[in-house]
């Protein structure tokens, strides 16, 4: 099984798709969302789009049904994506950019009042998604969670943490003051109940989770394990960092979650989810969205091991190296030092993840390409881990 996410057409070539298509060990591909992006031709990550002949159509931010259909068509012109669809079966779920950035049930960060009805926009986006993507429609088009089984080896549950019942994210920006962060209020507000999967989907997860299968694999969009900013940021000169990062340096090295769009913004429901999946023999939680590679042990609030999280790098979207440059290796190292359950991270390379699933272990392979800015590239050395059944990573 391979899995991937975050394929941004103007950001770079889909070389990792080509490598997945060529990998004869892969029987199935999971795409965990951000299959496409909604921005205008000169928007996010488009700096090299003209040079690479990867300007999107339509050239404005997509809002209408025709817009979403045309954007899907733009992506499907890519020969590497065509090759992947022609050579491998794919199971897909959406994340936010199939609609617009940081979507929740009733709105989105990247949807303003002058862009019309969000409900209509969401309906247009999901209609185009079902028209273009390898997914069957059901009676309720907003319910895309579903499960697949492989003998008594795998129970694969594909989830929707994005669109169906997600409450609005807590806005961390409101807690910053000049040279101060309102930590106590933020941490108290973070603990308040918020839906992410929501009651209906959690009930379904509970009904499908049991110990009949050696491995329960959850394909979903966002990082689930707690993530804290690395301590090294406290010692970096601010002028070497992008301006939007400056205020976050106040959080570096502290046990303060910084990304409330992830499960970190929904800690109460995360505990409910962890309690449910304890009924499985052994859990792997797959994630996309972050554009970086991660592998972590997962523990509940009582420090009980519940599974292993594996986060996929982006196919082409910018990751840490595009923000931090040469500092990224040290930042990766500091991330591990500042997050006790984080085993390894890579914010430099783009690519995908392969899982070789056996009864007693799963071998996890992070596959990378040397560049997304040219169609001439090299396969990079693979980083691998072995996850033993029902055991944390050492």
Model segments located where?
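Metal-dependent phosphoester/phosphodiester hydrolase catalytic core
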Residues: 1-394
